[in-house]
Amino acid sequence: MSKQIPFLLDTTSEIPKFRAETFWTKEPETIHWINRNLNESTDIGLLIDVGANIGIYSLYAATVNNSISVFSVEPVPDTFRELNANIELNMKTNQISTFMVALSYESGSGTLKNVDPRLGSSGAQIQIVASGDNASTKVLSGDRLLKDEWEKRDHGKKVMIKIDTDGNELDVLNGFIEAFKDGSIVTVLVETHPNNRNEIESFFRSLDFHEDESYLSVEGHSNYRREAKGNGERTKVYVCPMV
């Protein structure tokens, strides 16, 4: 019998059911990253879950540490509705804030491409377009999100970011450049791809962040499963110089 997940989830649809059943085994490094960084003595006050989907990692983080805040970012409307339903199901609306926007290197408008109609699916990507050109999706930079929704809370807590946007990760990172430079962000878990991995590495190196390779020893790390299947995606964890 599989280990029960520590939060409630609507599993009436196929993909959410799969996500619940594979929660502990699909990306154990993400669970380890959350556990390590959200211990009782943490100085982290906010997790930004970029590409939150139906909210499994947002909910897990909020369960591990009920004093932190979570920003769940999900631009696909049907998935966003399911995300909110799951948060309400767990009575976490005071802890988890949701945003039906896409994050990128600048604020504006865009269109979603490659949207799979199945609830809880992944793969959608944002394409920034001129306002009015069928631009149905709001786009924000991470710095704008933080300025509008986090800085007004007037505290010095640090930020951790999880990014899984199926190829747009570098654009998302560039949108947080001010927060990186002012020391707000202390660790990032990011899914990388063959076409952006070197640029992401260069981005972090320019900020004196380094990859924490200790996560590669987590049993069942998704990188090894992906490699065995010929999948080019790799999850990496980067930390600031002080960590």
Specify the residue positions occupied by each region the protein language model found:
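Core alpha/beta nucleotide-donor-binding catalytic domains of modification enzymes
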Residues: 84, 88-91, 96-117
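Short helix-capping segments at alpha-helix termini
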Residues: 66, 88-94, 180-185, 207-209
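S-adenosyl-L-methionine
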Residues: 1-95, 150-153, 216-243
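Short internal loop-to-helix segment that lines adenine-nucleotide cofactor pockets
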Residues: 21-48, 95, 109-111, 125-183, ...
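Conserved beta-strand signature within the Rossmann-like core of class I S-adenosyl-L-methionine
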Residues: 184-192
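Hydrophobic pocket-lining residues within nucleotide cofactor-binding pockets
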Residues: 101-105, 165, 192
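Conserved S-adenosyl-L-methionine
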Residues: 99-101, 209-219
